[in-house]
Design a protein with these regions (language model features):
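Anionic N-terminal interaction surfaces
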Residues: 2-79, 84
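A short, polar/proline- and glycine-enriched secondary-structure boundary/capping micro-motif
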Residues: 45-54, 92-97, 137
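Phosphoinositide-binding peripheral membrane targeting modules
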Residues: 66, 77-125
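Short, mixed charged/polar active-site loops
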Residues: 71, 103-105, 133-135
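An amphipathic alpha-helical interaction surface
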Residues: 107-110, 137, 164-165
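Canonical phosphoinositide-binding patch of PH/PH-like domains
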Residues: 131-151
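Short amphipathic C-terminal alpha-helix that caps PH/PH-like domains
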Residues: 146-164
Length: 165
């Protein structure tokens, strides 16, 4: 076997690894790209909606029996919230709908939320709407690897205030 044939798989591996590191560091140094991509994504489904009046944050929801956590785009304001299952594309610049979850977009008026529970660490929120419980897990970074701690804190504060009213 010719040893030069081993160079090609090794070269592909090195280029792929370098691209992965580049995307990770690119996300750490940016802020706001997820919000822009999220607003563009929402415009596809609701073209008449003024997306500028909504704040955007990312969480994870379990949609299946297999307990796979799917990233979900949360667009909210004090009176309503939208949940969109999303994944980022390979370049990390756009959001797409995961295959098989096209019908899981949800619009929830805040007044229809019957109960809200937030963990002390602020990494998980559960709420009940029409008898159906939804649990959202939050992480420090979103799919674009941007720090979203402040946005999560603002979201949980808004939901806690809505629960008090």
């Amino acid at each position: 076997m010719d040893t030069s044939m081993l160079i090609y798989p090794l070269l592909v591996f090195v280029i792929g690894f370098a691209a992965m590191i580049y995307m990770k560091t690119k996300g750490r140094n940016t802020k706001g790209n997820y919000v822009v991509a999220g607003r563009q994504y929402i415009k596809k489904f609701y073209p008449n909606l003024d997306v500028q009046q909504y704040e955007i944050v990312e969480g994870k929801i379990t949609y299946s029996i297999t307990a796979v956590h799917i990233p979900v785009l949360i667009a909210y304001n004090p009176s309503e919230l939208y949940l969109f299952p999303v994944v980022r594309n390979m370049t990390g610049t756009k959001l797409n709908t995961p295959e098989g979850l096209e019908e899981h977009n949800e619009h929830i008026p805040v007044l229809s939320i019957q109960q809200i529970g937030i963990t002390e660490k602020g990494d998980k929120m559960a709420f009940v709407v029409r008898g159906k419980e939804t649990v959202i897990n939050f992480s420090k970074r979103n799919s674009f690897n941007e720090n979203q701690s402040e946005e999560v804190s603002n979201f949980l504060t808004t939901m806690a205030q809505a629960a008090d009213n």
